[in-house]
Regions:
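Alpha-helical transmembrane segments and their immediate juxtamembrane cytosolic regions
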Residues: 1-242
């Protein structure tokens, strides 16, 4: 008798494990963007694939492309299972505001910059899911609410912009259609050939919270974003002088 393939056997990653994978990928990405981009050793060709020169910088940035989809997926799960959606949204907005000066310094060396950090994108994605649920039975209100959110994302010029907000909403809407979510979702963002690999840990998600349970641990995870950006800014300033 043939054994049927059981996908649940491979679902071994908790939400906390995916958070740590996403965090590591994000930090690597930002190390590449902030420090390695100017480092000669990181831009030497290691090998070539289809006439494309692969460097350490390219590898680090490619790994970094996996972070955002995982964070978006975690956001949709948090939205579904949080005890208070209002508090969840407030926390996202709070850390968007906290992260803005570190983001501005890292990108321009100034306290004010033309684009906004990714927490604003996550917050707007949260609002998109919120109004999608609130106005399920009122298509007109849903349309104009979502339209307003997308316009705000364009005006704010938040990281990943309206495409990022749309990606979050798509993941939420396709939560019960894994194959469509993974294949179509990878085409939402740039470099779909790389982004598709971010759905590997997502597919391995076992719907368990994991070890990040307490409030201090949760806020420490949030704080890792502005803190590491600020650290990278100071390192870059010390090494490169800008």
């Amino acid at each position: 008798m043939e054994k049927r393939f059981d996908a649940n056997r491979f679902r071994v990653l908790s939400g906390s494990a995916i958070k740590m994978i996403a965090l590591a990928a994000m930090i690597l990405d930002h190390i590449g963007a902030s420090l390695l981009i100017k480092a000669p050793f990181a831009n030497q060709t290691l090998f070539s694939v289809f006439s494309h020169n692969i460097t350490l910088y390219w590898i680090v940035r490619a790994v970094g492309r996996l972070a955002f989809p995982m964070y978006c997926f975690l956001l949709t799960e948090g939205f579904r299972y949080t005890r208070s959606r209002e508090k969840y949204g407030v926390n996202l907005l709070l850390f968007a505001l906290i992260s803005e000066i570190p983001w501005n310094l890292e990108h321009s060396g100034r306290f004010f910059y033309k684009t906004q950090n990714v927490f604003f994108t996550l917050f707007l994605g949260f609002l998109a899911m919120y109004f999608y649920e609130k106005y399920r039975n009122d298509q007109r209100k849903m349309f104009f609410s979502l339209l307003a959110i997308f316009v705000v994302s364009i005006v704010l010029r938040s990281d990943y912009g309206s495409k990022g907000v749309g990606f979050i909403l798509f993941l939420y809407m396709m939560k019960d259609h894994r194959a469509v979510r993974d294949i179509v979702g990878s085409c939402f963002l740039s470099n779909p050939g790389i982004v598709i690999f971010s759905f590997v840990p997502i597919e391995m998600y076992n719907s368990k919270r994991g070890f990040i349970r307490t409030k201090p641990a949760k806020y420490l995870f949030y704080a890792a974003y502005p803190v590491h950006i600020l650290i990278l800014y100071f390192i870059r300033n010390a090494v490169y002088g800008y």
